[in-house]
Amino acid sequence: MPPKLPDFANISERLRKALRLEHRIVVIGLSDTPPANLPHYEGEPLKACQMLDTVRFEGKSFYTVQNDHYECKNAIRWLGFDESYEGHFSGEWATGDYPDNGRALFRAPAFSRRMYEESPKVRVGTVKCAYYMPLEKANEGPARGDEVAIFVLNPRQAMYLARGTLYSRGGICYGMTGPGTCQSVIAGPFCTRQPMYSLGCFGARQFMKITGNE
């Protein structure tokens, strides 16, 4: 018999009340097979981080495949769908001239390479679909252990969440800011199985509906 799952709707309600969250907590799973009980995403082309907003604000559940993620060539690699584009891991793109020849995020390619070498990465080819759902509906999903929960918080809420995770295990909290948000808050905890805190990235703050204090 499969193990009995927690009551995710109750957990979501308690977390949102304790943290005073206005919007939903998002669950995203990285899997090799599409879940049979979720619909395929059929909306307008979005980046992986923008899809988080679809869940946060609209409460939708869906799965995506590789072809749904070409709006962001960074997420294609970080989520384990496909190989990187030319100039990505070499650091040339991250130091090139904006907008057509790069993003000028680093002064030298070596600095970009250091970031990527130190960042968690999902192995390419191991992911065939990414599925999204609100935490309160997670009992309707496959719950195969390949999911992570994503909270969009202000500093005070983040502090309380961090202290709460340490209450029953001790230690310290780790964060990662530098890579894309999809790598920091999706690939990071997926690979390490540890909570990961991030200030986000330029792309997420441009394309997601994140306020200045989140």
Residue ranges and their predicted role:
Residues P3-E214:
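Acidic, serine/proline-rich low-complexity intrinsically disordered regions
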